[in-house]
Amino acid sequence: MNKTPPETRTGEIAASPARFLGRGDAAVFDTFVVPQYLALFAERLLELIVPTEDARVCHLQCRTGYPDRDLLARLPNAHVYGCDNSEFAIELARAKAKTIAGFVHDYRVIEAFTTPFPPGAFSHGITLHPLAAPAERRRMLEELARIVAPRGQALVAMPLRGSFIEIADLLRECALKNELTELTNAVEAAVQLRPTDELFKRELEEVGFEFVDVDVRTRTLRFENGRQLFEDPATRLMLLPEFRVNLHMPDDAPFAYVREAIDKYWSDGAFELTVNVGVVTGRRKSA
């Protein structure tokens, strides 16, 4: 596992290896991860955005700026402010934004969720695929509550509980066969980190939003074999780093078991990975 670079060590969330995106990674992320994986979360989020004239949108954890181009189709003339911990992702987001005629944008590098914006500055606040850890979600939702204006809209899309259950099952099998009690406990704890739809709804309500609803749609990712799964850019840049953090896994031996098991059990067909795509939306309560 790559050592976390010094520039990402400020603040607990920013220091997570699951948040790091280097220069080369940012380009791969935008070229492959966005259309093949992140689009699963953006497509429904965009449909649920409430149109507003002269919208001001804050995109927390914006990475390389997706889906800000598509956002303009839903919110013409919107001003978009994107924030992320990766300077390389922000660099690419800025370059892409300059190719869109008339697009008013401001992309900034931030630490954790500390945005420089005043309270109530935005009509909309959005986030795609935040980390599963409850502390991460809480800080992100609290920041959305701070910067979204009364009656403004927040939208957050992420994998809900039950996502990636096939990998969890194979890790459980690995733990059972090798009598790894710590791994069994780690898998069970990691599975519980992701919210259910009811918990997701309650969390947004608790920070000051009303008319909250959660849209859930099940999608599948198909892989021909274990190698394709583990070499896929979405797995490498998004899923595995977070799995390692959530499982507190000291080495990758259990993942090697998963890869071999996929090749064994699914030798005659594709391996399908479940993703429960959840989008929570709500309106900021009036003061």
Name each region found by the language model.
Residues 1-27:
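N-terminal, positively charged/glycine-rich alpha-helical extensions of SAM-dependent methyltransferases
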Residues 35-55, 70:
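Conserved alpha-helix/loop element of class I SAM-dependent methyltransferases that forms part
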Residues 56-115, 139:
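Class I SAM-dependent methyltransferase SAM/SAH-binding core
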Residues 113-125:
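A short acidic, Gly/Pro-enriched loop at the edge of an enzyme's catalytic core
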Residues 123-138, 158:
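A short SAM/SAH-binding and catalytic strip from SAM-dependent methyltransferases
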Residues 134-135, 148-150:
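Helix-to-beta-strand junctions that scaffold the AdoMet/dcAdoMet cofactor pocket
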Residues 138, 151-224:
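Conserved catalytic/acceptor-binding region of the Class I
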Residues 213-268:
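C-terminal helical/coil "lid" or tail adjacent to the Rossmann-like core of SAM-dependent
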